[in-house]
Amino acid sequence: MRTQSRRRPRVTLAMAAAGTLLAPLLSGCWVGAGGSGSGGNSINVLMVNNPQMTELQKLTAAHFTKETGIKVNFTVLPENDVRDKISQDFANQAGQYDVATLSNYEIPIYARNGWLHTMDSYVADDPAYDEQDVLKPMRQSLTGDDGKLYGQPFYGESSFLMYRKDVFAEKGLTMPEHPTWTQVADLAAKADGARPGMKGICLRGLPGWGELMAPLTTVVNTFGGTWFDKDWKAHLDSPEFVKATKFYVDLVREHGESGAAQSGFAECLNNMTQGKVAMWYDATSAAGLLEANKSPVKGKLGYAPAPVEKTESAGWLYTWAWGIQNASRNPDKAWKFVSWASGKGYEQLVGDTIGWSNVPAGKRASTYTNPAYRQEAAAFQDMTKDAIESARPNDPGVQPRPAPGIQFVGIPEFTDLGTKVSQEISAAIAGRQSVDAALKKSQQLAEKIAKEYEGR
């Protein structure tokens, strides 16, 4: 693995509200009990309202509390709200919440700021947890600049290419075992119009750092581009970044879905489900929805690794994980909860009581050797595991990076920068401006951020 330059970015206390990468896992709001600080034999947990989280909430009292005697007070909020509340409580080190759900975007930043309790000693003293069973890229993405572990994944995802194998067979098309983007563009052109109203591919064009910029940044990486070099020089107007962006914009304009500039994860999911596109590059978590029992495309799909050009792999990495606040007055009890929620036993519990399709997968190697899970996810589980294991959060491109991240740059400012840049590129997808014009503006935005970090 290439040695990465990991300079220490400027500490900021305010975290911008984030977009979503795990769009299929979002649901409505429910707020549970949360006190002004945990005490006695209880802990306070602040978490996002994704379905798998609320399922955990329902199972906690009858299993975790019954086994340990520790009561868990949950506060459950929508994603943007929970991110805001977590950043406020953890930045102030108020200690109101012992545990919170954080992604691999926030955890290294929070660790750098001193807001999180390290988990190394807990892992070492808890052999039953089996930290080595956690997929290596997940462990890497939840490790701080100091090499210490600050989070444990609850579930995770990467990205890959989904395609209609029946349509490909009808058209005499073959998906390469390890496709390049050049090959994918050729296949998209040939599959375009394969059936009435069917387009060749669906790619996100909806503005958002976690919408359009997620897949596009993986394309930039494998084309040889980067947002910033190791010295914090902005490179959005570099030949590689420009080539990748023009490729992406041209592909989606020529052979992509209608209304691409307003299409995010949800819209592409609908297009794929309804047979309106022959291919879709997006989150591995989408496969479970496409292969659901009532899905009209169940059994009709094939899966391939994220397309590449100059790199060996290109898939992104994202996880909802658990972090323990440094100011927690109950870190030992907090670890017991984290160990239970992210442990092998909890996955077995969910599989036995709710169903294996509901298991919070994407984090442990043992999940993918479990016969019950393998049967449930036979169509895509091997490709999903391979995608996650091949993700390189510290070395996603062809050059050293100043901060970790594949589909994002691991600095607090990226949520705002990424969203603004995505708006410019989405306008190019819509035909309102050229890619060159979009990236000229974007370079200026990135240079302002770069000045904050240069020389550090």
Describe the residue ranges of each PLM region.
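Hinge/lid segment of periplasmic solute-binding proteins
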Residues: 104-158, 212-215, 298-304, 385-392, ...
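Short, solvent-exposed loop/beta-turn-alpha elements that line the ligand-binding surface or hinge
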Residues: 120-134, 177, 201, 205-206, ...
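Glycine-centered hinge/linker elements that transmit conformational signals in sensory
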Residues: 187-190, 231-262, 302, 306
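Extracytoplasmic "Venus flytrap"/periplasmic binding protein-like
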Residues: 63-134, 169-172, 271, 275-279, ...
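Conserved C-terminal helix/tail region of periplasmic/extracytoplasmic solute-binding proteins
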Residues: 2, 71, 169, 392-456
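A structural signal for short loop-to-beta-strand junctions that line the ligand-binding cleft
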Residues: 88, 96-100, 128-167, 199, ...
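C-terminal lobe and pocket-closing loops
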Residues: 124, 286-297, 310-320, 324-419
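Extracytoplasmic/periplasmic solute-binding protein
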Residues: 143-154, 159, 182-234, 246, ...
